[in-house]
Amino acid sequence: MKAEIEELQRSFGEIRLFPENSDDLWHLHNLITPGSLVYATTLRSVEGSQDKIRPEKQEKRPVRLGIRVEDVEFHEYSIRLRVFGTIESGVDIGSHHTLNLEPGYEISVIKSWSGSDLERIDRAIKGSTSEAIHILTVEEGEAELYRVQSYGPKQVWSLAAGSGKTAEVSSREEFSEAVVSQVSQLTGPLVIAGPGFVKEEIIAKFKRKNPSRSAPLVIGDTRAGGRRAVQEVIGQGILEKLNGDLQLAREVTCLDELMRRIGKDEPVAYGIDAVRDATGCGAVQTLMVVDTLLRDPDAADLIRQAEAMRSEVVIFSSRFEPGERLAGLGGIAALLRYSIA
């Protein structure tokens, strides 16, 4: 993502944003909230004198509109962001319109920006200069490859070995050759992780096949394979070492600490009412909010209050397991400095 930030007056103002990939659209999905004013060039039907006689001949032309946002949808597989709202600037003021944003579009967003918003923009800018990180998880007879997106790991390939109906290769040799062949196509940083010694065999073959590879290769020891191994790797801080991105690791470690404290009956709050009480007492050390609540006025107000008290604020991705677990606790929780019971 590229961004041009005008001087903000008391955190309010205009920021021009230039999304470059699906990760950037995901960031925009969390930055554009109801009530924001978004300017973008879009296609809209323009009526002429002939159009009134033959409305089916209405022509769509590019126009620049300002939309007062009502809702936003992120479509991961079509790589598109849909912004719904009412036109406040441009043609047909007062009419409803949907902006269909894709990588390469330029938009301007006018709103009150929170500290977590500006942190997200900074993260997106830094992420645009980094190559994609892949994590290969390997255990006996099973391999899965994940691409690390801003909103969590996405499985892009898998392979099973054995004699069952779901097996794709039958021998250990075929399995390791197929895995090495697949990951040898990658050019960016690679993490190979899993329990036991199977990964060691894969790593040795990979290095023999790619002796001149310059991108980082990191080994991760985990207790499990598959998606659980990916979460372990992220929690170990390996992504931070590869590209400096702390966010996903923060989500893992904060959720782990929350569950540990709940299990030991140590100071925490979860659910909107309990967190509101803790915030009012100034007891919040770390506020955790799942991104689906960013459009909720009560949650947004608690974020602003927490930032004003210099509490840490961590926004969780609803598409990553820690965020899914946080959603099960009401979508918002806090680690407290002291008990308020």
Swiss-Prot record:
It comes from the Archaea. The keyword Hydrolase applies. Keywords: Cytoplasm, Endonuclease, Hydrolase, Metal-binding, Nuclease. The N-terminal domain has the RNA-binding Sm fold. It harbors the endoribonuclease activity. One of its GO terms (biological process) is nonfunctional rRNA decay. Pfam families: eRF1_1, eRF1_3. Its cofactor is a divalent metal cation. Gene3D superfamilies: 3.30.1330.30, eRF1 domain 2, Pelota, domain A. The gene is pelA. InterPro entries: eFR1_2_sf, eRF1_1_Pelota, eRF1_3, Pelota/DOM34_N, Pelota_arc, Ribosomal_eL30-like_sf, Transl-rel_pelota. The keyword Cytoplasm applies. Belongs to the eukaryotic release factor 1 family. Pelota subfamily. Monomer. Its EC number is 3.1.-.-. GO terms for molecular function: endonuclease activity; metal ion binding. GO terms for cellular component: cytoplasm. This is Protein pelota homolog. It comes from Methanospirillum hungatei JF-1 (strain ATCC 27890 / DSM 864 / NBRC 100397 / JF-1).
